[in-house]
C-alpha cells in the first residue's frame, strides 16, 4: 500500500523528509531541518519566511515546528505531496504554483510597515486583503492553517503540548 496523508499523520504527523542542509542531504524532521538551516528546493527563502510568519500567526509554534521545511519538502514530491491542498481540489502538479502565489501575496502584504501577520490573517479570513491576486485569500488562510496545524500538532509531541493522550491508529516506528 502506498503512503497516504492519513498514514503520514497517523505515523507521527510530519514524516521524516530529506532536506538540503549545509550542502548535504539529510534525513530529518521539519523542525530539525529548520533548526539546522535547511536550503529550500522549491520555494525561495523569502517565500518560506512569509509562509512561516503567517503560519505562526495562525498556529503559534508552526514556525518552530518547521512549517517552511514541511511545505517545501512536500512540494518537492510533486504528485506524491501530502499537503492538504491536494485533498481540497488543487491539482498536485499545480501545488507549487499555488503555494508560490500564496507566498508572493503574503510577501507583498507583509511589506507594508503598518501590517502585522495577525492583521493580515484577519483580512485573509474575510477576503478583504486589498492587494491579493490568485487563490482566494480565505482559501489560502484555510490551507495554510491546516498545514500549520499538521506540522505543529500532528506529532506525539504536539499532542503532549495540548495535554491530549496520543492515540494513533498506527503507532510511529520512531520518534523524533
PLM region spans:
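C-terminal segment of N-terminal export signals and the immediately downstream linker at the start
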Residues: 2-7, 19-57
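Short alpha-helical "patches" and their helix-cap loops
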Residues: 5, 66-74, 159-169
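Sec-dependent signal peptide hydrophobic core
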Residues: 12-16
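A generic secondary-structure boundary signal that marks alpha-helix termini
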Residues: 17-18, 63, 153
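Flexible, low-complexity segments enriched for small/polar residues
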Residues: 37-40, 48-142
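Long, amphipathic alpha-helical surface segments
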Residues: 130-176
Amino acid at each position: 500500500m502506498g503512503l497516504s496523508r492519513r498514514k503520514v499523520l497517523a505515523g507521527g504527523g510530519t514524516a521524516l523528509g530529506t532536506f538540503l542542509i549545509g550542502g548535504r542531504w539529510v534525513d530529518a524532521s521539519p523542525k530539525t531541518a529548520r533548526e539546522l538551516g535547511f536550503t529550500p528546493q522549491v520555494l525561495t527563502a523569502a517565500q518560506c519566511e512569509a509562509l512561516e510568519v503567517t503560519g505562526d500567526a495562525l498556529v503559534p509554534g508552526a514556525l518552530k515546528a518547521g512549517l517552511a521545511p514541511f511545505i517545501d519538502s512536500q512540494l518537492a514530491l510533486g504528485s506524491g505531496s501530502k499537503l492538504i491542498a491536494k485533498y481540497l481540489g488543487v491539482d498536485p502538479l499545480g501545488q507549487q504554483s499555488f503555494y508560490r502565489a500564496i507566498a508572493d501575496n503574503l510577501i507583498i502584504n507583509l511589506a507594508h510597515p503598518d501590517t502585522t501577520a495577525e492583521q493580515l490573517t484577519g483580512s485573509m479570513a474575510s477576503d478583504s486583503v486589498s492587494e491579493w491576486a490568485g487563490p482566494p485569500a480565505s482559501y489560502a488562510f484555510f490551507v495554510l492553517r491546516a498545514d500549520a496545524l499538521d506540522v505543529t500538532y500532528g506529532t506525539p509531541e504536539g499532542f503532549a503540548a495540548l495535554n491530549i493522550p496520543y492515540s494513533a491508529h498506527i503507532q510511529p516506528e520512531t520518534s523524533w
